[in-house]
């Protein structure tokens, strides 16, 4: 399967060229779109029971004001929430996209021309097909972005608009405009995925670890193995174990503990954070909206022996 990947940047985003991280950002965006295109091709082939070929996928930074074809041929606008950043993105299907897919599903060649543009002409079948495709796209992008981007990111389809005027869309806002073009039989279909340009700032704050890269961060692994130094840990995700401070159990009671026993804790809100067996910070533990929250009060210098028992100094 031959696929063409095109990366372009419009004049509206010329400032991006000044960024020293632009090359890295492009590489990450290339990998994300290439990975998604492969996954979507497999999904679409299975869904339509037809051969699906990727024609091209492109990225450009711009607004809908300078890319009016995106909204003038709109059939449905899917509003996507990017969590936890609370950013809004959009997946836009043009006219004939859903109708051609339905035509293929019912044995046609995908060359059906839908000339209706009224909201009442949106069928329940189109809504169901849109929902199924959107579920795959959001799930796929969530998983792919977690591999190349940040672990906590998720895409959620919150609402679908079949009338562009019903959503207060900012035509001048800059987006990463991702266009995916596929061929089914002899019919080409495409859709656009608009991701806010501001999402790039989160890329700059993270260190990318691709699952396709063979290298390992041996420096961090070595530092954790020998000693934990907060100066050596940055832009990485680590597993931290929290231990409660102030719990005491008598020697005799340890051997008589049973399910249901209640143990007294002097300071139930005090905890010490550990990486492996090394204490790294002191903090307060709270429960808020069914979530466990830790407020870090002080970092512990692992090179100083005087801090080894510091977590007990406030008893």
UniProtKB/Swiss-Prot annotation:
Name the keywords, alphabetized. Answer: Bacterial flagellum, Cell inner membrane, Cell membrane, Chemotaxis, Flagellar rotation, Membrane
User: Is Membrane a UniProt keyword of this protein?
Assistant: yes
For this protein, the record's InterPro entries field holds: CheC-like_sf, Flag_FliM, FliN-like_C, SpoA-like_sf
Membrane-topology descriptor: Peripheral membrane protein
Kindly give the Pfam families that the UniProt entry links to this protein. FliM (PF02154), FliMN_C (PF01052)
GO CC annotations on file: bacterial-type flagellum basal body; plasma membrane
Compartmental location: Cell inner membrane; Bacterial flagellum basal body
* Molecular-function GO terms, alphabetical: cytoskeletal motor activity
Q: Give GO terms for biological process.
A: bacterial-type flagellum-dependent swarming motility; positive chemotaxis
Q: Which domain of life is it from?
A: Bacteria
What the protein does? FliM is one of three proteins (FliG, FliN, FliM) that forms the rotor-mounted switch complex (C ring), located at the base of the basal body. This complex interacts with the CheY and CheZ chemotaxis proteins, in addition to contacting components of the motor that determine the direction of flagellar rotation.
UniProt family annotation: Belongs to the FliM family.
Q: What is this protein called?
A: Flagellar motor switch protein FliM
Task: Write down the species.
Answer: Buchnera aphidicola subsp. Acyrthosiphon pisum (strain APS) (Acyrthosiphon pisum symbiotic bacterium)
């Amino acid at each position: 399967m031959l696929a063409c990947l095109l990366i372009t940047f419009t004049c509206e985003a010329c400032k991006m060229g000044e960024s020293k991280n632009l090359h890295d950002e492009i590489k990450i965006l290339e990998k994300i779109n290439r990975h998604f295109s492969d996954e979507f091709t497999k999904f679409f082939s299975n869904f339509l029971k037809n051969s699906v070929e990727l024609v091209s996928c492109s990225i450009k930074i711009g607004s809908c004001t300078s890319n009016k074809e995106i909204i003038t041929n709109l059939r449905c606008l899917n509003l996507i929430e990017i969590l936890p950043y609370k950013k809004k993105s959009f997946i836009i299907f043009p006219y004939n996209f859903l109708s051609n897919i339905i035509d293929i599903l019912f044995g046609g060649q995908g060359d059906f021309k839908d000339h209706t543009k009224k909201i009442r002409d949106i069928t329940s079948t189109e809504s169901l097909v849109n929902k199924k495709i959107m579920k795959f796209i959001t799930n796929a992008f969530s998983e792919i972005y977690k591999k190349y981007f940040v672990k906590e990111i998720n895409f959620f389809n919150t609402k679908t608009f079949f009338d562009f005027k019903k959503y207060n869309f900012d035509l001048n806002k800059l987006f990463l405009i991702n266009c995916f073009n596929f061929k089914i039989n002899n019919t080409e279909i495409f859709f656009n995925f608009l991701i806010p340009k501001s999402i790039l700032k989160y890329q700059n704050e993270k260190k990318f670890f691709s699952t396709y890269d063979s290298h390992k961060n041996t420096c961090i692994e070595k530092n954790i193995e020998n000693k934990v130094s907060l100066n050596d840990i940055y832009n990485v995700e680590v597993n931290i174990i929290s231990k409660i401070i102030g719990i005491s159990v008598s020697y005799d009671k340890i051997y008589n503990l049973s399910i249901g026993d209640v143990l007294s804790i002097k300071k139930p809100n005090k905890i010490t954070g550990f990486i492996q067996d090394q204490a790294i910070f002191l903090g307060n533990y709270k429960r808020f909206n069914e979530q466990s929250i830790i407020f870090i009060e002080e970092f512990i210098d692992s090179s100083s022996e005087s801090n080894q028992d510091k977590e007990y100094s406030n008893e």
